[in-house]
Curated annotation (Swiss-Prot):
The lineage of its organism: Bacteria, Bacillati, Bacillota, Bacilli, Bacillales. Belongs to the class-II aminoacyl-tRNA synthetase family. Type-1 seryl-tRNA synthetase subfamily. L-serine binds at residues 231-233, 285, 385. Homodimer. The tRNA molecule binds across the dimer. ATP binds at residues 262-264, 349-352. This is Serine--tRNA ligase. It comes from Listeria monocytogenes serovar 1/2a (strain ATCC BAA-679 / EGD-e). Pathway: Aminoacyl-tRNA biosynthesis; selenocysteinyl-tRNA(Sec) biosynthesis; L-seryl-tRNA(Sec) from L-serine and tRNA(Sec): step 1/1.
Length: 427
């Protein structure tokens, strides 16, 4: 949620930045109109209340002097009725303004590239060499089926499309990746480990920006009015909802493994095969709470923490700075990490690392005090995937495959796999 003062005092500047996002400005314009009406009503209400106080004093004086006060009493009744009417309108406007505020996205940071589509995202750097195969490489869904480590068919029978069973060494590979990532982030990158709830309430989904605008993308448990989490970002960020943190305790850095659940509304026909776009998938998340002046340095470090996973797995990747049109609702600046997937002959997103500045903190009321007794300020929140597990498995299967259909295990994972170096075709 944006600062109301920013909207009031820098209306045209904010409007331009939202235009750079490609946003429909209808709701934003409506905010300006309603806020103008609200200020007019406040001025009128305050004037009437002042008038009512004066009339009350005049009535008291007339009564003390045994004079007729009926006319003044009638005047005060009319004024009182008008104040009640204005107060009702003010409450209605405040409710509308709150709803509009919840629907306005974050404004891009000045370093975010201005663009009209994903084609305008800017490549920042690349790492690793794309492998040149001397045989026709298989897609990960075929590799997983042939190796008997991924089962999409029975998952479709048990549940439906966009689900998978990990089996045998496939399940062990996923578990090895989880442990490797969590160990790296907690032991070397300084994150505190968490295992969060997989269901959250509406206040939590609102705090991180999924609600009210993106409810159709979430899975709702109607009987309880709980949502299955789309990412561990939601419960971990809301861990500090309504908290006032101490400055000396910042930054707070958390890493969390969780299953994630997404309806993928609007994704019909896209990535229908394999692990790239599932309704349920595992992910290791990185979340930070920092002082405002530290958040952009923190973003670079957080992005580097996610990159380190790919480097140690020796998977080729690139980093993109996302343009204004491809930024997402809550971010002021976002980097995407894309890993090379041979079956697509392209890089595919495997992590997003974002600085939300105070956008989420305002929605979730997460603040800190610089000194005891000082006025609380909003923290800046950041998060990133470190990494998405299904896409990491897909990248390993495809990039580490051999001509005989086997898949080598990255060296960094072999200790987590009990020394297993290769997944071979069943005999």
């Amino acid at each position: 949620m944006l600062d109301v003062k920013l909207l009031r005092n820098n209306f045209d500047e904010v409007k331009q930045k939202l235009q750079n996002r490609g946003e429909d400005l209808g709701e934003f314009e409506k905010f300006g109109e309603l806020d103008k009406r609200r200020r007019t009503l406040i001025v009128e209400t305050e004037a009437l209340k002042s008038q009512r106080n004066e009339v009350s004093q005049e009535i008291a004086k007339l009564k003390r002097e045994k004079q007729d006060a009926d006319a003044k009493i009638e005047e005060m009744r009319v004024v009182g009725d008008r104040i009640k009417t204005l107060d009702i309108e003010l409450r209605e406007i405040d409710e509308k303004l709150d709803m509009i505020l919840m629907s306005i996205p974050n404004i891009p940071h000045e370093s975010t590239p201005v663009g009209e589509s994903e084609d305008d995202n800017v490549e920042i750097r690349k790492w690793g060499e794309v492998r040149a195969f001397d045989f026709e490489p298989k897609a990960h869904w075929d590799l997983g089926t042939d190796l008997d480590i991924l089962d999409f068919e029975n998952a479709a029978k048990v549940t439906g499309s966009r689900f998978v069973f990990y089996k045998k060494l496939g399940a062990r590979l996923e578990r090895a990746l989880i442990n490797f990532m969590m160990d790296l982030h907690s032991n070397e990158h300084g994150y505190e480990e968490m295992l969060p709830p997989y269901m959250v309430n509406r206040a939590s989904m609102t705090g991180t920006g999924q609600l009210p605008k993106f409810e159709e993308d979430a899975f709702l448990i109607e009987a309880e009015d709980y949502f299955l989490i789309p990412t561990a970002e939601v419960p971990v960020t809301n861990y500090h909802r309504e908290d006032i943190l101490k400055a000396e305790d910042l930054p707070r850095k958390y890493t969390a493994f969780s299953a994630c659940f997404r309806s993928e509304a609007g994704s019909a026909g896209r990535d229908t095969r394999g692990l790239i776009r599932q309704h349920q998938f595992n992910k290791v998340e990185l979340v930070q709470f920092v002082k405002p002046e530290d958040s952009y340095v923190a973003l670079e470090k957080l992005t580097g923490n996610a990159e380190e996973v790919l480097r140690r797995l020796e998977l080729p990747y690139r980093v993109l700075s996302m343009c204004t049109a491809d930024l997402g609702f809550t971010a002021a600046k976002k980097y995407d990490l894309e890993v090379w997937i041979p079956s697509y002959n392209s890089y595919r997103e495997i992590s997003s690392c974002s600085n939300f500045e105070s956008f989420q903190a305002r929605r979730a009321n997460i603040r800190f005090r610089r000194e005891p007794g000082s006025k609380p300020e909003y923290v800046h929140t950041l998060n990133g995937s470190g990494l998405a597990l299904g896409r990491t498995v897909a990248a390993i299967l495809e990039n580490y495959q051999d001509a005989d259909g086997s898949v080598r295990i990255p060296k960094v994972l072999q200790g987590y796999m009990g020394g297993i170096e290769k997944i071979e075709l069943p005999k």
